[in-house]
Amino acid sequence: MGWQEVDGSDSNSMGGKRMRPTLAMLAADAVGGDLERATPIAVALEYVHNFSLIHDDLEDLDRVRHHRPTVWAIWGESAAIVSGNAMLKIADAAAWKLRSVGVEESVALEAESELTNHYLKMMEGQYLDISFETEASVTVDQYLDMIERKTGALIEASIYLGGLVAPRSGPDRSKAKALKSMGYE
């Protein structure tokens, strides 16, 4: 399950913006939190994002992403499905490590639940995106609803969860919620 080139050699690619984990860490810093406490959720968010890209490439039959062949284009559809699914479970396992960096049990459970709710919302957006392919037209409101779910859900989760788990004295929900809403203001 490592990163490999077409010839099977290890990849040293540093591609991608890592926007979601960066937002989580920035939110953690914004609330005066401990960045180590936010690291497991930041890692989880990146794995969820990669899961979504692997499946999106297959669903859209995109053979190239960022000038590189996609997983399914190299290894086949079945391998892409399994790889994407594995990424999602690795994301869950990363989130479970919140406790090992000192996040309280109740906060860790809340963060894991929020992560799941947000990636399910992201999947709803992907479903809408796929369904639009057979529509003669899509309204602006329909598109905005789709993109809010498909892309916005994980961005919202990144900002919210980074702010939620990082404070050493426990979560400041008012600050975390303020961060969560900033993309909507």
Name each model feature, range by range:
Residues 1-185:
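Mg2+-dependent prenyl diphosphate-binding active-site environment of isoprenoid biosynthetic enzymes
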